[in-house]
Amino acid sequence: MPPPSPTVAELQQQLANGEVTVREIVEAALARIDALDQAGPSINAVIELNPEAIDIADALDAELASGEMRSPMHGIPVLIKDNIATGDQMETTAGSLALVGLKATADSAVARQLREAGMVILGKTNLSEWANIRSFQSSSGWSGRGGQTVNPHQLDRNPSGSSSGSAAAVASGYVAVTVGTETNGSIVSPAGNCGVVGIKPTVGLVSRVGVIPISHSQDTIGPIARSVADAAALLNVLAVPDPEDSASRGEWPITVSAATPAATPEMTILPIPSYPAQPDGGVPVVDYTAELDPTGLQGARIGVVRSQTGFSPHADAVFEEALAALVAAGAELVDPVEVPSGADPAWGADTLPVLEWELKAGLAEYFAGFLPEGAPITSLADVIAFNEENAADEMPWFDQAIFLNAEARTGLDDIEYINAVIRIQAAGRDNGIDAALAANNLDALVAPTNGPATRIDLVNGDHWLGGTSTLAAIAGYPLVTVPAGYRHGLPIGITFMGGAYSDATLVRLSYAFEQQVAVWQEPAFTPGGILPPA
């Protein structure tokens, strides 16, 4: 079997020493994919390979031969999630058959940045279709176009999602780094279940332009990698301010008039929603690899969010081991830390409706901007109709109930929507993460990422145990998940969370933790069945 991908640092050193060419790196990655993705364990993480990958590699080799190096990531291959537009020969479908053949007319900002850095976009990864916003009964990692991605640690286990293929591809050693997207948990959850590192950046740090959306208030794009160092190297490429992105500008895209009538007398207009508050000077441009300090936990004050435990005894046991490792590395724990909004479940009723409102508007905007002129898909209603007409292929396992709810929503100037966004943002920020950090003078919070992977169940859908991503999702704040241990051969991670634009701090803390525990294991590609003892 072809060996797994070297790390980013190893590839960089090999290229610098002339030990390998970009073409050879790309060919090795393609060989690994060929051996594992549709053959052997059949991980099914890759939905499409880039037919131009070898030609791109040759061009990058020629640049190196002439002394030109675009960035430290020159020549490094990357796989990107199939909701990130590329204006090339590849499709961009969000896993949906409705978009097959309607190739994007331009690169997304992320794809453009990867190319400008000299990275080779090797292909697209499978995902939970439409980033898991179609149905309440979905199976993470399944799409009508791509089928079901499996977990490389045990092949009958779910990889989680929605960036399922991106996490499974890194865990399987196809490439050192991939790109995922997250609205709520879609980077950190699959990274946790597949035993790799995932960084969910602050909303606004990475441009969303050209990414098939769910939510303009919560969507973000980030790296998935085998190590924090590799993820930080990719984050340097991705984290570029973009005036075309409303979150990067820090300007809420909907103008609300104070004279707009409320739907009911009780629904008064609150302040206009906002994106995460930017530091002076705007979106920070940081070298995240400069944060890779093995002593980075010394003197750090970290709050333990006990309210986010208890959903899995296995996750709880690994979490206790992780807390001991944090102390051993020099951190000071505040245990427990109370998150004020955690005691008030009322805001939870607003979270999905906000996504439904924003999905309907966001898809129409993406289709108008990135699909070819005359495309038969221009709205969510068109996607719903396509699914109904092609139900045997698109809905063999689960329906489109969330799509139907979203289509029934009104516009983004609806006061009910505006107030709902404000309520959940307050729960995530002023009464949530910000409150916990400020009250205890903390650098970050920590909690289990999720439980060990459950079995794939296409008939009933995901068996969700629990996770810690929601507060950061509604706040628009960053998360980093790192492998912390294993139970029965299945990985379990912990998540560091912080305030707006604390991404660099979280990279520093997570790197130091990773070096302290050093638990990462290659997946065993174990066939389905009874798990081994812990």
State what each model feature region is.
Residues 29, 53, 75, 81, ...:
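Conserved hydrophobic/aromatic pocket- or pore-lining residues that grip, position, or stack substrates
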Residues 35, 116, 120, 171-306, ...:
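Structural helix-boundary/capping segments
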Residues 74-94, 257, 291, 296-305, ...:
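Short helix-loop capping/hinge segments that flank enzyme active sites or metal/cofactor-binding pockets
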